[in-house]
């Protein structure tokens, strides 16, 4: 069996890394879109090393989980994450949707561009997922031995995982890019 915990909410560097990996955005493009989202009141300040969420943000994330995914995906108490960077700039909390209730990505104002919408969706999903239950499943291994005339036995091994409870992965797939994530949901 395996248990997989969600990643913490975004810091500046993790947002840039994930936007590059999932959205193919350069760091400058990510920060431009984040700046616009911040200036329009959709996200918190985007220059931070902190992974902590305020109590208000934890409550908003839990409300999002209950509404979008169901109470069975919500842990008994909010998750907390410690910042690993020494001398971290923790005056600001993690990058997250702003406000007492997180705006759904479909409800962003019409004047937000495509980059802003994509980046906000990434932030919204990661913040929600950071407060969801662990994903759980089983590891499987299959080995096949085949006899060959010239080289003796040949051994083939395949490993994989099955999912018993998707947990946070319903909201945010960490190890796949967007096209793989969409295929996984289908």
Features from the language model and the residues they span:
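Long, highly charged, low-complexity internal segments
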Residues: 1-35, 39, 70-71, 86, ...
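GHKL/Bergerat-fold ATPase module in large chromosome/replication-associated machines
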Residues: 97-100
